[in-house]
Amino acid sequence: MSRDRGVCIGVDTSCYTTSLAAVDAQSGALLSQRRKILPVPMGQCGLRQSDALYQHVLQLPDLFRQLLSDSKEFAPYHVVCVSVSKTPRDVEDSYMPVFRAGVAFANVMADSFGVPLYETCHQTGHLLAATAGSGDEPERDFLAIHLSGGTCE
């Protein structure tokens, strides 16, 4: 990647996975992604939000280091924007504490790099990833059904 092309960093801290991605700002090509599932203690059915938030705080710095080391072609000064899932859904009062870890981390990155921060919702991220992963740009509006552990839309 040439020096004049930028990288967008995406951050998502959902109920069970810490996720980071680096995307070519011009082409939209995925350059690197790192994910780590949150550990659930043996015998437990899940994680409390407070425990999950804490695990994200622990995992984000190392995942970011790994993301940067995945591709020596981009360096921090090539970052042109940061995007983060702020809420589970794009509706008023949609809130889960786990997303605060990602928002805090993304704010620090955006401020450190002096770049804009774009906030989105987790559910929209799933839909955008699906359309990007299909290889085809949608030519018109489409109907999508999203089924997840915590939300259906």
Task: Give, region by region, the residue ranges found by the protein language model.
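Short acidic/glycine-rich loops and adjacent helix/strand connectors
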Residues: 1-153
